[in-house]
């Protein structure tokens, strides 16, 4: 098992101590030095798995005359090891530091800190020395791993968007000069991936750039990824736990450099008989799950492309090398999560200095732990797609897009949730820190401590929350789950209509949500994600007749100014009633078909034009009914 910590956003280094460093914008990276001697000291990190190996990575701009050194220490049996040097960068040159004397507890083997016993905690630090120009630190990463469970068989292959082959131009290390050809599998693989990202460099140039000036070798994992990171790419060493994680990278259009080891006859069709360590590029998967690669050990360009049997490749990579990979890509397209109780999604990268209930720039709100995809960085802002709030754009479904402040995001891995906050606001206790979480926030409940529930957080810490504030995910839609939708919507009764509002946590308790935000939160509590705005909610819903309506189903109204566009949604409460966040009245309220349209539900048909009497001057609108509650896939 392995786990990788990626430190690329301000929240990722929460709790660290810095000296002589100045935080910089998210677009630029993490810090820049502001004195001749600087230090970054991480907090003590408790790993989610016991580990016996640790590998570090960094991306930085290190001017000539400056240096950067990464060190780590681990705790074994309540004893801290000394600090071990994982690598040094002096200007554009790299230096390894093999342990002079093997510690009783651990030692450095090229690029890996190896432990003689398992550890659960580690700490790392970066030491900087600077002359006139500052060093800019863009990224840090640490991978911890153990050999537990490596021998299990891989999961059966399931076809998906990873059944594809990325167009990675082939290179053969065997065509390089004799002094390189047998030792540059890593630089050759790196060259293929850099070329894929429109950074064409000759293999020999890459080899000299990543060469370890201590051992004169070319294959130090940390140095190879550090070099790639100097081209404004996100680049780090990781270990993936199975091929399914590689498949996700391929599906997103990102080739993966992988390390393999095998004995004679163990990897059919390989250009070399055996190897203790060799790097190649995974470019895709076949229909039956076999692995498509560009293997730089091939004797010529035409034979670089290979297809390796899935089972044999899995052994050579995951079992023999613990799934080691280089993950290299632009920042755009990477996944992250929201690390604050609520984040405002804006149409432009401008801060919300003052709350305006009808601010047209305010698009939506995201809750703690929600998954996002990064699209663009601009200063201290990042354009994202909200993966749990779908939108129908350019003919297909994708995350709702907008700008949030980078201080709100984290690259931590969110534990798989099994519970959800069911009250409007709930206090989460993490040591001396308190977080005010919104209804709809999803959490991983680990167990109970009296009247409190213990939950796992993305930064691998735990916290406590009142058990009565949580609800387990439903695994079926029934009368109880439908009633829970109504109960959740009722939490907002009497609050003000808030354009883009989608959270129980607002600057003032009187501030509520917009119509589709109310629906989104009510459905999240039963574990169902639906699109963000009313138009998309109607588009993806299952149409219903008026006689088919059940509690919790939805009612849609067209825009009076554009009858082809849906602009309002309400939640059916049974009988003749519904609950809504009504813009014309400025609040979340109950109403009825008879009151609003002059006729009861029984006399109003799907797609009929009705008169909306909620306006001072009644308006004509089309009305529709829809459901997500019986035939839609449900979140497990």
Predicted regions and their residues:
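Conserved active-site-adjacent core of cysteine acyl-enzyme catalytic domains
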Residues: 200-330
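Aromatic- and glycine-rich peptidoglycan recognition patches
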Residues: 280, 291-331, 417-418, 430, ...
């Amino acid at each position: 098992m392995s786990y990788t910590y990626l430190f690329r956003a301000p929240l990722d280094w929460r709790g660290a101590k810095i000296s002589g460093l100045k935080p910089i914008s998210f677009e630029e990276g993490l810090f820049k030095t502001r004195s001749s001697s600087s230090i970054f000291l991480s907090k003590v990190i408790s790993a989610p798995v016991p580990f016996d190996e640790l590998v570090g990575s960094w991306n930085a701009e290190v001017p000539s005359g400056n240096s950067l050194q990464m060190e780590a220490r681990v705790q074994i049996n309540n004893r801290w090891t000394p600090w071990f040097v994982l690598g040094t960068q002096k200007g554009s040159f790299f230096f390894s530091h093999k342990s002079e004397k093997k510690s009783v507890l651990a030692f450095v083997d090229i690029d890996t800190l190896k432990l003689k016993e398992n550890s659960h905690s580690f700490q790392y630090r970066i030491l900087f020395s600077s002359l006139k120009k500052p060093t800019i630190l863009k990224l840090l990463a640490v991978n911890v791993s153990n050999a537990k469970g490596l021998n299990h068989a891989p999961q059966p292959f399931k076809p998906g968007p990873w059944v594809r082959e990325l167009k990675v131009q082939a290179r053969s290390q065997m065509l390089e000069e004799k002094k390189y050809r047998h030792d540059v599998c890593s630089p050759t693989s790196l060259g293929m991936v850099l070329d894929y990202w429109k950074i064409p460099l000759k293999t020999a140039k890459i080899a000299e750039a990543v060469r370890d000036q201590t051992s004169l070798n070319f294959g130090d994992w940390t140095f190879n990824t550090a070099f790639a990171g100097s081209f404004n790419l996100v680049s780090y060493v990781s270990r993936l736990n199975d091929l399914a994680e590689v498949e996700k990278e391929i599906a997103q259009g990102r080739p993966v450099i992988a390390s393999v080891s095998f004995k004679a006859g163990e990897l059919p069709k390989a250009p070399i008989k055996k190897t203790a360590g060799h790097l190649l590029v995974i470019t895709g998967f076949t229909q039956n799950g076999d692995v498509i690669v560009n293997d730089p050990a091939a004797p010529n360009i035409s034979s670089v492309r290979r297809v390796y049997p899935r089972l044999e490749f899995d052994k050579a990579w995951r079992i023999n090398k613990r799934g080691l990979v280089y993950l290299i890509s632009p920042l755009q397209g990477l996944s992250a999560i929201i690390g604050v109780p609520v984040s405002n999604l804006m149409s432009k990268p401008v801060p919300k200095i003052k709350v305006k209930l009808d601010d047209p720039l305010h698009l939506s709100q995201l809750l703690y732990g929600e998954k996002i995809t990064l699209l663009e960085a601009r200063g201290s802002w990042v354009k994202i797609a909200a993966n749990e709030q779908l939108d129908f754009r350019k003919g297909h479904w994708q995350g709702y897009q907008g700008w949030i402040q980078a201080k709100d995001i984290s690259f931590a891995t969110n534990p798989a949730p099994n519970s959800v906050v069911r009250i409007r606001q709930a206090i989460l206790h993490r040591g001396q820190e308190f977080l005010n979480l919104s209804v709809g926030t999803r959490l991983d409940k680990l167990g109970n401590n009296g009247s409190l529930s213990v939950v796992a957080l993305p930064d691998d810490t735990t916290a406590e929350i009142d058990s009565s504030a949580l609800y387990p995910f439903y695994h079926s839609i029934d009368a109880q789950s439908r009633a829970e939708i109504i109960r959740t919507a009722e939490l907002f009764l009497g609050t003000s209509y808030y354009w883009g509002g989608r959270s129980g946590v607002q600057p003032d308790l009187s501030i509520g949500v917009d119509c589709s935000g109310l629906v989104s939160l009510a459905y999240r509590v039963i574990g169902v994600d639906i699109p963000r705005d009313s138009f998309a909610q109607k588009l993806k819903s299952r149409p219903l007749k008026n006689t088919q309506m059940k509690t919790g189903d939805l009612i849609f109204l067209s825009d009076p100014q554009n009858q082809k566009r849906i602009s309002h949604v309400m939640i059916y409460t049974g009988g003749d009633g519904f609950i809504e966040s009504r813009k014309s009245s400025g609040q979340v309220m109950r109403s009825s078909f008879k009151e609003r349209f002059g006729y009861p539900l029984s006399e109003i048909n799907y797609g009929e034009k009705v008169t909306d009497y909620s306006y001072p001057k009644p308006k004509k609108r089309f009305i529709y009914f829809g459901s997500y509650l019986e035939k839609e896939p449900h979140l497990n």
